[in-house]
Every structure is written in structure tokens, then in C-alpha cells.
């Protein structure tokens, strides 16, 4: 009898000791998990608040998220600014240290050294083939040229707006545009696009579907072409597949981390006349100086006012963002 009682008491004590050990082990494990989670959270928080140096991120699709406007206190300490300029500017300035000089001037406006990037492009036509806008704020300087006015207008329409695009297989399908916001965007070293509108019996309207020469030409030897046709009508499409791509795109709205500075010209290009531009506002400005030093001085002087009409974005942008839907 006493042996049974002793055994019961012993088992009870062992159970208490074992339970106490288990509870302590669980507590240690939970402490480890909690402290490790806090460490990871602090590290990630520090990284997200750190300076973004404009890495070439492979972002596809239109996934931008609007951040607080630049009037927020301390915005320049956690933001990057990209300034895109033509080769003509650096050639005219002819000074190996001109970028360093401008960086020091931007510093007086609150932009830390290393937060402003200067990116050169050869000409508007080539830049339009592969526009890469990786900074939080992007200013594109375009020298006005009467002969390139339409190219400038199309490039501005492209980079000042968000586009959601899908590839097009013209060998298998006919395509139609569903509304004013629906366009076909072609890019490449040389794009010639022809279309043949079809009736309900898929017969050509004013053209022969079997004769490409009878198609209507809507773009010829262009590097960027935003094609607009009559809505609700199927079209058979032909384009130079070896040097060009074409995508079926829908304009989603303004891309507010991009602004265009037009250099010269009597009037600033107006893309708001396009009914797809909604609201009817644009981030296009004009400076009228003959010398590029004057242009850059003006931009430095007014950089903070320019930024205030823009919004910071969370994603980088490259030409793939115009092409593939996520």
C-alpha cells in the first residue's frame, strides 16, 4: 500500500519536474523567435528607410504605388533624382567636372551628394526605344526640334503615363481597340506598321487581307509609334517583325514620378489634347535658354518647386513595364 503511494507521489513529482523543463524550453524557444523576429524587423526597417541608389530592378507590369508628396519633411534624405539629358548638353559644356559642380549646387537645395544621378542619352528617337526611369523622381530634358515634334510628343505620352500591355500575335489573331485608352505601342530600331480594317465577314475594308501592299500604313520607319485606329473594328496587322515589337496597351493614368522639361521652342508641347489624358494636366515645363549651363542652373533653382507637383513611386520602370502584364 505504501509502495503504491510512494510510486504515485514519485510519478507526480517527476511529472512536475518534466512539465517545468518543457515550459522553460518552450519559453526559451519563444524568446529566440521573438528576438530574432525583432532583429529582422529592425534590419528591414533600416533598409527600407535607407537611400535608394537607383538599382536596375527587373520590374514588369504597372505596379506603382503612390507615396506621400514631396512636401513631406525630409523627403530628399530618402529619395533619388535622375536627370536625363541629351549628349548635346555635355558636348557644349565640355567640362569633365560639370556633374560634380551641379551636385554641389543641388546640395544647397537639400539634395545630398549621391542622391542626384545624371544620365545621358544620344537623342530623343533612340531614348524612346528603351526608356529606363529608375529613380524616385525622374526629370527628362528634351531639346525642342521642329522636325522631331511628333516624336517628342509620343515619348512624352509614353513616359508621363502608366501603360498596361500584352504581347500581340498577329499571325493567329485579328485585333481591335476597345476604347480611347486602348492603343498599340510599337518599339524597335525601325517600325513600319500597316493595318487592314475588316468588316463582319472578315473581308478587308478598302484593302485586301492577302495583299499587304494594300494595307493602310500608320507608322513608317519609326522607333516609337503609338497607333490609334477606329474602336470596335477588327484589324489585320502587319509590321516589321525583325526590327520591331508591338503590344496591345491600355493607358491607366498619369505616372507622377516623371516630368518633362522642354528646352526651347515657342510653346510647350501639349499632350492634354489627347482625350485619353485624364485628368487634363501634365508635368511638362519649358525653359528657353541657348546655353545648357543656363538650363541646368534654372533646373537647380526650381528643382523643389518641380518636385512638389510630382509624387514619389515605389517601383523602378523600364521598357519591360510597357510590355508584359503581371
Swiss-Prot record:
Disulfide bonds: 82-135, 165-249, 191-244, 196-207
Binding site for Ca(2+) 1: 95, 206, 214, 216
Region called GPR motif, residue ranges: 253-255
Annotated signal sequence range: 1-50
Region (CNP motif): 165-167
Keyword annotations from UniProtKB, A to Z: Calcium, Capsid protein, Disulfide bond, Glycoprotein, Host endoplasmic reticulum, Host-virus interaction, Metal-binding, Outer capsid protein, Signal, T=13 icosahedral capsid protein, Virion
Stored Pfam families: VP7 (PF00434)
InterPro entries linked to this entry: VP7, VP7_1, VP7_2
Location in the cell: Virion; Host endoplasmic reticulum lumen
UniProt keyword Glycoprotein present: yes
Keyword Metal-binding: yes
One term of GO molecular function: metal ion binding
Carbohydrate attachment residues: 69, 238
Chain positions recorded as Ca(2+) 2 binding sites: 177, 228-229, 231, 301
Protein family according to the UniProt entry: Belongs to the rotavirus VP7 family.
HAMAP family the UniProt entry points to: Rota_VP7 (MF_04130), Rota_VP7_A (MF_04131)
Function: Calcium-binding protein that interacts with rotavirus cell receptors once the initial attachment by VP4 has been achieved. Rotavirus attachment and entry into the host cell probably involves multiple sequential contacts between the outer capsid proteins VP4 and VP7, and the cell receptors. Following entry into the host cell, low intracellular or intravesicular Ca(2+) concentration probably causes the calcium-stabilized VP7 trimers to dissociate from the virion. This step is probably necessary for the membrane-disrupting entry step and the release of VP4, which is locked onto the virion by VP7.
Protein name per Swiss-Prot or TrEMBL: Outer capsid glycoprotein VP7
Originating species: Rotavirus A (isolate RVA/Human/Australia/A91a/1991/G1P[X]) (RV-A)
